[in-house]
Amino acid sequence: NIRVHEIWRSTYKRGCFQEIHDHLPHHLSGVLFLDDHEENCGRFYFHHRHYSELTQEWKELYFPQSRMYIPAKRGQVLLFPSHMMHGVSVHRSDKVRRTVAFNINLELNKQNHSKNENLS
């Protein structure tokens, strides 16, 4: 079973941003972009949780930046594991940026799960 645990709308005006965070203990999180990306708009990004622990060689080879920016497209839904660190950069536009975000929990059918364990 899939259960939407929370849903909320975010409105970003000039100077607004969202600090780096995750959505534990949920399983999946998502964001629906209500606007296309425009210049100076806040940008959704994923943050590499262990970036500061990487050696310079690994950073140069595989992770040149600690953040991966996702271009917003109106109507696009982005799903990701809730443990992934993410945020929104500072919004520097006079045009409002809008999103709808949500958390999802996956609920196992405990009765069927127990039956499968007894097969061994």
Task: Label every model-predicted segment.
Residues 102:
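HATPase_c (GHKL) ATP-binding subdomain of two-component histidine kinases
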Residues 85-99:
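Ligand-binding loop in jelly-roll beta-barrel domains
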